[in-house]
Amino acid sequence: MVTVGNYCEAEGPVGPAWMQDGLSPCFFFTLVPSTRMALGTLALVLALPCRRRERPAGADSLSWGAGPRISPYVLQLLLATLQAALPLAGLAGRVGTARGAPLPSYLLLASVLESLAGACGLWLLVVERSQARQRLAMGIWIKFRHSPGLLLLWTVAFAAENLALVSWNSPQWWWARADLGQQVQFSLWVLRYVVSGGLFVLGLWAPGLRPQSYTLQVHEEDQDVERSQVRSAAQQSTWRDFGRKLRLLSGYLWPRGSPALQLVVLICLGLMGLERALNVLVPIFYRNIVNLLTEKAPWNSLAWTVTSYVFLKFLQGGGTGSTGFVSNLRTFLWIRVQQFTSRRVELLIFSHLHELSLRWHLGRRTGEVLRIADRGTSSVTGLLSYLVFNVIPTLADIIIGIIYFSMFFNAWFGLIVFLCMSLYLTLTIVVTEWRTKFRRAMNTQENATRARAVDSLLNFETVKYYNAESYEVERYREAIIKYQGLEWKSSASLVLLNQTQNLVIGLGLLAGSLLCAYFVTEQKLQVGDYVLFGTYIIQLYMPLNWFGTYYRMIQTNFIDMENMFDLLKEETEVKDLPGAGPLRFQKGRIEFENVHFSYADGRETLQDVSFTVMPGQTLALVGPSGAGKSTILRLLFRFYDISSGCIRIDGQDISQVTQASLRSHIGVVPQDTVLFNDTIADNIRYGRVTAGNDEVEAAAQAAGIHDAIMAFPEGYRTQVGERGLKLSGGEKQRVAIARTILKAPGIILLDEATSALDTSNERAIQASLAKVCANRTTIVVAHRLSTVVNADQILVIKDGCIVERGRHEALLSRGGVYADMWQLQQGQEETSEDTKPQTMER
């Protein structure tokens, strides 16, 4: 019968870590299994939200072999199963070869922890395979990798088996194979080495997550691909593709193109390393002071130690490095780096938005796009700050603390710190993930409550009409009560989190303090060591109090960053072809040849449109609304690319030249002129931003608006207001004409430029437009036919086709569509003239 003896082979503590030319087996098989178990638990915690959110209906419709590769995955599954079973086999081997000798307790603990860690790895492998099959079933495929947690778990296992080789010459290990027990343990080590090495290599390859060589066919009756993709995108875990997100983020950490800021980054990282050293040195000097006071050391030694301690404390700050000189210096230096990163991201997004097509902008709400851009910029700088200067330093402090206590105190202290910190982080992440749903529900209800109040106040008159004040107050009260109920859950869960953290801190401090006090009474440690332990532990725990906040903020920032990167992934619809050259403008001959075009709905807006505008001529486009007249102008300006056919200017296909050169030769006067919230002078100067004040005034005089501008108290420096609301419709049109005059293009496009004006303003604007269009190729989209009677050619567009073409007189003589439109408009104008006196008489 096998009995269980002391924790280690020899009576005493786990340490020292190194003895008899090798690592202590007791120390090694306590630290490694505990580390692997903590990593496995943490990986499971991070995987659970992902598992919970990614379980859509119909995700299991694939057969076992229809997903990613199965043959290498079976091998990976077998190795993971062996990794979970081998520790128990090793324990059985120990029991079978013990020959009545007591079995050290650490072997039992190591076997259980190693098996549980292996089981965590096995479960994660199965879950990730299942998630890969789900995404494939939903028609989504990206570059798959195992999660960082699983890879780290397998890496640590393989590294631990290699670490055992440093004890090759130690008689405590099984390398000599002197008896049956050592031979069995050596054989099991070889098997573990092969298994862990195989899992490490296969983990990097991830065969169970890679696609088959054939193409998967998804039956339409079984899968709604479009809805599945939307659902998956909305429900996927924040931590999915964590490594890819970190790589994207790391690109903004290093300020490319600025050697000075790169040096600042290196200095900041060096200061961060100095803070880690200070967090170790401050408790050590505090311990030395206590020991010197206990030993009644000379005043000189005590004064020097106290002075050094206070100086280090000044550098460190209030115990956590958050307000010390080093931290403040790092924060000060980082301001420029943060501004550089923010500026770079903002300009990247803004430039990309201007490269996207008109089709994309018409389908998006500008406020939503700008909100994504703002949040994305803040998320990049916030993530860099949280990860680089909060999370990573905190984890580094924990690792340094574990190593320090294991080496200079006892391995038990390192184990206590490790277990407490692991439990602390795990519980923080679990509870934070759990309470996220309360926070989300509270935010949703807060928006609903605010919307209820806004809606009631906006409809103030309606509330008064129906004497519904008490009803509205009651509805608002119910919304507040519902919000406060959710707020209570969120606040209560935060209290639970804080109390859980406090409990873990207390248990860890109690265990370590009792052990430290015991060693002090045994005269293995000094009184100062007890003080050092308590100071160091509290110092480690203080930044961890904010770890839940960091975790939640990192989640939020990752979501915002994903939205920003999704925005940056939007393809530019209209692109310059590789090698495209500038437009060689000559006289302005425009040709449309068999042009077909359709918007996103698939319905053809233009069908086989062909026409030619000779240099200096005016072409008018008329027809009912929605016929495709404005679309022709947008195609010529290349807001869209045509489906088929060809558009040429001076014999050059406009799709073969750069967009900038094309648009530099075209001036547009739209129906609704939108002005920038700037001065009148700057709005006119927008036609050519390098123009001087004299040129701006000359353009305004040519457009007939100079006198109106000078009538304003501030003249050309008058602010036009948002979207030019301080100016009348006629004044805004004249500003647009002045812009076009200043641009001096070779081609003019008039998109119903006077249709929104009254008759007197229209006639005045027409006179200004005639000056602008003189000797320039002009295309006019007209609603009032009387404005285009002098056009060199008139095209009648109906349902995307040219149904008639010719001059005004010729079209009237045909008695077709144009003649009917003319008669209808003439009748409407006569009716309008007849009713004016009657209206005046009333």
From Swiss-Prot:
The keyword Transport applies. Residues 265-556 form the ABC transmembrane type-1 domain. InterPro entries: AAA+_ATPase, ABC1_TM_dom, ABC1_TM_sf, ABC_transporter-like_ATP-bd, ABC_transporter-like_CS, ABCB6_N, P-loop_NTPase, Type_1_exporter. Changing residue 629 to M: Does not affect subcellular location in early melanosome and lysosome. Does not rescue the normal amyloid fibril formation and normal maturation of pigmented melanosomes. Does not influence trafficking of melanosomal proteins. Residues 1-205 are annotated as: Required for the lysosomal targeting. It holds the Pfam family ABC_tran. ATPase activity is inhibited by MgATP with an IC(50) of 1.03 mM and up-regulated by coporphyrin III> hemin > protoporphyrin IX. ATPase activity for hemin is up-regulated by glutathione. The ATPase activity is impaired by increasing copper concentrations (0-300 uM). The ATPase activity is stimulated in presence of glutathione for increasing copper concentrations (0-300 uM). Widely expressed. High expression is detected in the retinal epithelium. Expressed in mature erythrocytes. Residues 48-72, 128-147, 207-263, 313-375, 419-499, 551-842 are cytoplasmic. Changing residue 69 to G: In a breast cancer sample; somatic mutation. Residues 1-26, 94-106, 169-185, 285-291, 397, 521-529 are lumenal. It is found in: Cell membrane; Mitochondrion outer membrane; Endoplasmic reticulum membrane; Golgi apparatus membrane. N-glycosylated. Signal peptide: none annotated. One of its GO terms (molecular function) is ATP hydrolysis activity. GO terms for cellular component: ATP-binding cassette (ABC) transporter complex; cytosol; early endosome membrane; endolysosome membrane; endoplasmic reticulum; endoplasmic reticulum membrane; endosome; extracellular exosome. Changing residue 447 to Q: Does not affect N-glycosylation. Does not affect N-glycosylation. Does not affect trafficking from endoplasmic reticulum. Changing residue 531 to A: Loss of substrate-stimulate ATPase activity. Impairs protein expression. It is a multi-pass membrane protein. Induction: Up-regulated by cellular porphyrins (at protein level). Up-regulated during erythroid differentiation (at protein level). Induced by sodium arsenite in a dose-dependent manner. ATP binds at residues 599, 623-634. It is linked to Microphthalmia/Coloboma 7: A disorder of eye formation, ranging from small size of a single eye to complete bilateral absence of ocular tissues. Ocular abnormalities like opacities of the cornea and lens, scaring of the retina and choroid, and other abnormalities may also be present. Ocular colobomas are a set of malformations resulting from abnormal morphogenesis of the optic cup and stalk, and the fusion of the fetal fissure (optic fissure). Dyschromatosis universalis hereditaria 3: An autosomal dominant pigmentary genodermatosis characterized by a mixture of hyperpigmented and hypopigmented macules distributed randomly over the body, that appear in infancy or early childhood. The trunk and extremities are the dominant sites of abnormal pigmentation. Facial lesions can be seen in 50% of affected individuals, but involvement of palms and soles is unusual. Abnormalities of hair and nails have also been reported. PANTHER family: ATP-BINDING CASSETTE SUB-FAMILY B, ATP-BINDING CASSETTE SUB-FAMILY B MEMBER 6. Belongs to the ABC transporter superfamily. ABCB family. Heavy Metal importer (TC 3.A.1.210) subfamily. This is ATP-binding cassette sub-family B member 6. It comes from Homo sapiens.
